[in-house]
Amino acid sequence: MPRPGKSSYSDQKPPYSYISLTAMAIQHSAEKMLPLSDIYKFIMERFPYYREHTQRWQNSLRHNLSFNDCFIKIPRRPDQPGKGSFWALHPDCGDMFENGSFLRRRKRFKVLRADHAHLHSGSSKGAPGTGPGGHLHPHHPHHAHHHHHHHHHAAHHHHHHHPPQPPPPPPPHMVPYFHQQPAPAPQPPHLPSQPAQQPQPQSQPPQTSHPGKMQEAAAVAAAAAAAAAAAVGSVGRLSQFPPYGLGSAAAAAAAAAASTTGFKHPFAIENIIGRDYKGVLQAGGLPLASVMHHLGYPVPGQLSNVVGSVWPHVGVMDSVAAAAAAAAAAGVPVGPEYGAFGVPVKALCHSANQSLPAVPVPIKPTPALPPVTTLPPALSVPTASQQLPAPSTVCAAAASPTAPLLEPTAAGRADSKGSSLHSVLVHS
């Protein structure tokens, strides 16, 4: 089909694709590149069909410019008037049309990613001034060689004038706790002619000047750490259980260190309890409070000595009579303001005008425990013929309000001789 002449163009749609129309407009320009507005202008002047419905075909033409590799976008130089970028043909798309005819396109031009990067790096086939490639990158081939030569020269210069620097010296050795390490001497500014190994001996601290002091400091620090670990682990724990997080060997070493150093934690129970209670606690073995008795759990006999030795403030008390007897047998002087357990008696008594008793007495009998065959004399259950001790032995002011409450309790105890003792807790 022969190429139609300009005089034969009519208002009918021309047989050219948008890619052919754009390539035709670019090749007819003097600089082989046109802005988008000039491409529109060329098409509308050449083909009257595109003078109508401009918005439709212009949108399609813009999409073809953006999504086809045969068109290259060139930024506008600052000295060029106008706005918008230029569009040019790819240097390698010359054979895209058969025999230079825009009627038929041989195949869609596709630029490989390696070739595209090679083109932008300066290895384009077009020479300066011979085509669009000359406008894009006129000096890239020489620039690549020059850059390589410059890089090689810089590396050669750095190799001759700047020897490779040694790795930075290690940080000064940190001696634990109180041993202060001398600060390293400041290094002079590095000069190219001076080797970098010279200021290193100055920066090394004199660690070998006092080997005896360092060993002694390390030994003292290790002993202090072991004592602290033993103290933290042993406070509030039984002696037969190792501290949390320490093995058997570590626990034994910590216990030995704690026993030899005599370290006492500031919050140890020996430092918290007042001096007035130490005589009662050490002599009679009677504690100030009984955690297990608070909870209502009986303490076995084989654990009473362990609990009394490890936890002086925790133990077992069963009755006021047993406590008073033990304190009297030990011959420990107890002040008039303290009871047998070291608890102020005045705190347990209330004024006579109060209606509630000072000592909480259970109204309903508690569930009976399994019968006990033998009980100590101090803990035997009183029979019906025996009289209960008057409440005035504990506090005279609390006798009258507690009398009507203790009578049904005594009757219930007399009926159930086989039940165990339900002692009343007389401390706070």
Curated annotation (Swiss-Prot):
Residues 193-217 have a biased composition (Low complexity). Residues 12-103 bind DNA. PROSITE patterns: FORK_HEAD_1, FORK_HEAD_2, FORK_HEAD_3. GO terms for molecular function: DNA-binding transcription factor activity; sequence-specific DNA binding. Residues 164-174, 183-192 have a biased composition (Pro residues). It is found in: Nucleus. Its main location: nucleus. Keywords: DNA-binding, Nucleus, Transcription, Transcription regulation. Residues 136-163 have a biased composition (Basic residues). Residues 118-217, 408-428 are annotated as: Disordered. Pfam families: Forkhead. GO terms for cellular component: nucleus. InterPro entries: Fork_head_dom (IPR001766), FOX_domain-containing (IPR050211), FOXB1_B2_FH (IPR047389), TF_fork_head_CS_1 (IPR018122), TF_fork_head_CS_2 (IPR030456), WH-like_DNA-bd_sf (IPR036388), WH_DNA-bd_sf (IPR036390). Transcription factor. This is Forkhead box protein B2. It comes from Mus musculus.
